[in-house]
């Protein structure tokens, strides 16, 4: 990960090249000393397809792909499609009624700046 020192008062976007595509990412405050470039893939079909293609070249042998709800959904969906896989697992942010005996685990998210629980259906664990 590259560390870039910025003046957030005057620097509102960070240009980044991802999978050969240039994008302007908004600079977002996490706390008083940490700012991140907010990468949101929703709605950017070209970026989703190209990013998935590059990630598929690097993904190790696996049983199933998994992502956390919600920003990873389009990416893992496209990766599964490109890899010819018919299934992937989604870790939900809250237990759902259809989840019989959900399994929960805590993760640290930098975009929400706090710990959060994720939930899997027991049969997916």
Regions found by a protein language model. Name each.
Residues 52-54, 75-76, 116-122:
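A generic local structural motif
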Residues 61, 85-86:
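Short, well-ordered coil loops that connect the C-terminus of an alpha-helix to the N-terminus
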Residues 75-84:
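Short Gly/Thr/Asp-enriched flexible loops that form oxyanion-binding sites at enzyme active sites
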Residues 69-75:
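Gly/Ser/Thr-rich loops at beta-strand to alpha-helix junctions
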Residues 1-61:
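Active-site-facing substrate-recognition patch
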Residues 62-69:
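Short glycine-rich phosphate-binding loop at a beta-alpha junction
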């Amino acid at each position: 990960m590259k560390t870039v020192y910025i003046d957030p008062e005057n620097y509102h976007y960070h240009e980044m090249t991802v999978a050969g595509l240039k994008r302007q990412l908004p600079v977002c405050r996490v706390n008083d000393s940490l700012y991140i470039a907010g990468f949101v893939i929703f709605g950017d079909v070209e970026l989703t397809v190209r990013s998935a293609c590059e990630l598929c070249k690097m993904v190790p042998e696996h049983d199933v792909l998994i992502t956390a709800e919600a920003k990873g959904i389009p990416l893992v969906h496209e990766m599964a499609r490109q890899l010819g896989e018919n299934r992937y697992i989604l870790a939900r942010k809250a237990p759902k009624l259809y989840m019989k005996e959900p399994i929960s685990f805590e993760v640290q998210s930098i975009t929400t700046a706090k710990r959060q629980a994720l939930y899997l259906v027991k049969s997916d664990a």
